[in-house]
Amino acid sequence: MAASITASVWGTLLKIHRGLTASGCLPQSCVHTSAVLERSRHWEMKNRIVYPPQLPDEPRRPAEVYHCRKQIKYSKDKMWYLAKLIRGMSVDQAIAQLEFNDKKGAKIMKEVLLEAQDLAVRNHNVEFKSNLYVAESFSNKGKYLKRIRYHGRGMFGIMDKVYCHYFVKLVEGPPSPKEEPMTGFQQAKEYVQQLRSRTITHGL
């Protein structure tokens, strides 16, 4: 008896949900206006920046390539560790590191790096595809999808299908040398200086 009542209630709830979705009262899954997708959209638009002509005595401006992949079925936190691993490496060294990493995100990041390397040669006038290094590499939260997780006794919960975005910036030239890590005293001194250099809005 209790099982039949639970089944009828569950069926009624599903009918109400379908009716609301069809009538437009609930937001559709294709509509997404968060700042996360806005950032991923603006990232590749940086490739369209046109700089003014340089003077003959100025050093040549290195080429910059912005590339990303959106809605990767992977956790942004797991992707962050891999993104931090290759930051500051040459592109060949980064691809070699990801080649021998057995994580799922490493294979995806390797594909993104190869795509960015190909874009640099085809669209950004880079002569040698190996003459690039990873200037920026980070992950960000994607659009999560909510789904029903079924429990016992006719109950249910809401779970998230996790997605992430991955962003990379390649710059032409050799990688910059790594800086010496700051000591605790230097970090504290820099922090105090930042506090002292603050400005009060609408102040004298």
Curated annotation (Swiss-Prot):
Q: Which InterPro entries match?
A: Ribosomal_uL22, Ribosomal_uL22_bac/org-type, Ribosomal_uL22_sf
Cell membrane keyword on record: no
- Top-level taxonomic group: Eukaryota
Q: Where in the cell is it found?
A: Mitochondrion
Task: Identify one Gene Ontology CC term for this UniProt entry.
Answer: mitochondrial large ribosomal subunit
Residues of the transit peptide = 1-27
Look up the record and give one Gene Ontology term from the biological process aspect: translation
**Record keywords, A-Z:** Mitochondrion, Ribonucleoprotein, Ribosomal protein, Transit peptide
Short name of one Pfam family for this protein?
Ribosomal_L22
GO molecular function (one)? structural constituent of ribosome
- Work out whether the entry's keyword set contains Mitochondrion: yes
Q: Which family does it belong to?
A: Belongs to the universal ribosomal protein uL22 family.
The record's note on quaternary structure and interaction partners says: Component of the mitochondrial ribosome large subunit (39S) which comprises a 16S rRNA and about 50 distinct proteins.
Q: This protein is called what?
A: Large ribosomal subunit protein uL22m
The organism of origin for this protein = Xenopus tropicalis (Western clawed frog)
Q: Which gene encodes it?
A: mrpl22
